[in-house]
Curated annotation (Swiss-Prot):
Domain of life: Bacteria
Positions in coiled-coil regions: none
Pfam families tied to this protein: Ribosomal_L17
Organism, scientific name: Streptococcus equi subsp. zooepidemicus (strain MGCS10565)
Protein name: Large ribosomal subunit protein bL17
Assigned protein family: Belongs to the bacterial ribosomal protein bL17 family.
Cross-referenced Gene3D superfamilies: Ribosomal protein L17
One example GO MF annotation: structural constituent of ribosome
Keyword Transferase carried by entry: no
Gene encoding the protein: rplQ
CC terms in the record's Gene Ontology section: cytosolic large ribosomal subunit
Length: 128
């Protein structure tokens, strides 16, 4: 299987890809290097496909990869409580239904200007 090493050990690379995948699911658009964007595209596409399946096994597989981070927090004045939505809940309730009729190609990579400082090629990766 071909993949990019991204100048890191396998555990560091896996952690970074999990973080970037979770950030993309929460924010729906992130700025990163071109190589990282191309690499996380694979995992994000797999997570959205799991979200479209929607069964318990798919939810557990996605939960094993996506970080348990809060995606949004809303205040309900009637009950005087905060309700929060995690990245996993957002994946299954908001993102996956949006792509129900689409077979793959859930992300878009737009190349931008090189990063100032080391001239690394940068890109914006976003959900279509």
């Amino acid at each position: 299987m071909a993949y990019r090493k991204l100048g890191r050990t396998s555990s560091q690379r896996k952690a970074m890809l999990r973080d970037l995948t979770t950030d993309l699911l929460i924010n729906e658009s992130i700025v990163t290097t071109e190589a990282r964007a191309k690499e996380i595209r694979k995992t994000v596409e797999k997570m959205i496909t799991l979200g479209k399946r929607g069964d318990l096994h798919a939810r557990r597989q996605a939960a094993a990869y996506v970080r348990n981070e809060i995606a949004s927090e809303n205040y309900d004045e009637a009950t005087d409580k905060y309700t929060s939505t995690t990245a996993l809940q957002k994946l299954f309730s908001e993102i996956a239904p949006r792509y129900a009729e689409r077979n793959g190609g859930y992300t878009r990579i737009l190349k931008t200007e090189p990063r100032r400082g080391d001239a690394a090629p940068m890109a914006i990766i976003e959900l279509v």
